[in-house]
């Protein structure tokens, strides 16, 4: 029973790490958007297309990744019982992190356009 609890705690830590990293990245991107509007920097940061991309990725990381990863982490912390997590449960946080990284690649020049 303790082995299953450790597995669930490890999975919860991974999901919480993903959620926290997404929220931190979202905050940094928000800071970048705000800094681009400050008058001393505004004359140098005039790329409105980049600002739109940063805003889209900021919202995606903050809403999609954060609000998806946090409930999964809480579920793993609250789960109880003799059954272990599924065979592929350890792979899921890595797959979600790859998806979050794919969201961030939208910031690269020539890689997509905001809708």
Feature-to-residue mapping (PLM):
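N-terminal signal-anchor module of multipass membrane proteins
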Residues: 1-69
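Membrane-interface helix-loop-helix modules in multi-pass inner-membrane proteins
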Residues: 34-38, 53-115
